[in-house]
Amino acid sequence: MDFILNYALFFFKIFTLFALILTIFLIIVNVARHKSKKKYELDIVSLNSYYEHVKNKIILSTMSTYEKKIWNKSNKLFKKTRSKINMTFLKKNKYYLNQNNPILYVLDFKGNVSASEVTSLREEISAIILAAKENDEVLLRLESGGGVIHGYGLASSQLSRLREKNIRLTVSVDKIAASGGYMMACVANYIIAAPFSVIGSIGVVAQIPNFNKLLKKNNVDMELHTSGLYKRTLTVFGENTKEAREKFCKDLNFTHVLFKEFVHSMRPSLNIDEVSTGEHWFGTTALEKKLIDKIETSDDFIISR
């Protein structure tokens, strides 16, 4: 009897372990499949339909019950008639593509320190380049306080692809485009910004804590071995030298020069030495300094189109 009970308990343990492993495996497969699908999917929303819906809701909210009935009836009749006209037109013009109505593609970029949204931005831009017709435009609603230069450098390069294909790019800044964020914004053919948005901060910053004295105080040795004179300049735990600090600052200044040259190449009318001090300004002052082209929100820009 004990043998049967022990065997049943052993079998139950094996079954539980197998079920647990299978569950974990299925979760991993499901997540991987979801990521794979997500990588190649773009959500496309018609802003025309959205604003039309909002407008109709506001109109209806101001009407009496009788007025709503009349409006709904006439609106249904209009849609039905328009649908018939469109179907007749398409039947007669099977291969016709409407080239006369330019499209405004609206993209969003909400940047973090690593500019991780560049992954989706590159796919969106590739899709637009493949589909865009003559006179189509792109609006990028940008919000970023900057971050690592290689991340924002790549994001700026992605936006440059639109300019190279002669697709007009407008960047709108409703809140902030500073440092790496402005590196992206300056690529645009036209920059608009809200009055109190934060613009500029064309500079480079780096700060590193050093715990070497604390380690020495507690009798902790720290060894750092490198191959190459400047493989490591400033460190967190090692002892930093004067030469290392000078090299670090030299690299920092060189990066700033590259940043300035890039911004100036995109906006030649800027007094680059005046605006590249690392300062930031509100939208109204940024307009005076030619960092932007117009005071306007993204909402006004979209509705005007």
Curated annotation (Swiss-Prot):
Segments traversing the membrane: 9-29, 185-205
Gene Ontology molecular-function annotations: serine-type endopeptidase activity
Source species taxonomy: Bacteria, Pseudomonadati, Pseudomonadota, Gammaproteobacteria, Enterobacterales
Active-site residue numbers: S179, K231
Keywords annotated in UniProt: Cell membrane, Hydrolase, Membrane, Protease, Serine protease, Transmembrane, Transmembrane helix
Protein name, as recorded: Probable protease SohB
Membrane protein topology class: Multi-pass membrane protein
Subcellular location: Cell membrane
Main localisation: membrane
CDD domains per UniProt: S49_Sppa_N_C (cd07023)
Similarity-based family: Belongs to the peptidase S49 family.
UniProt keyword annotation of Protease present: yes
Listed EC numbers: 3.4.21.-
Keyword check for Chloroplast: no
Enzyme class, spelled out: hydrolase
GO-annotated biological processes: proteolysis
Domain of life (superkingdom): Bacteria
GO annotation, cellular component aspect: plasma membrane
Any Pfam family matching the protein: Peptidase_S49_N
Gene that specifies this protein: sohB
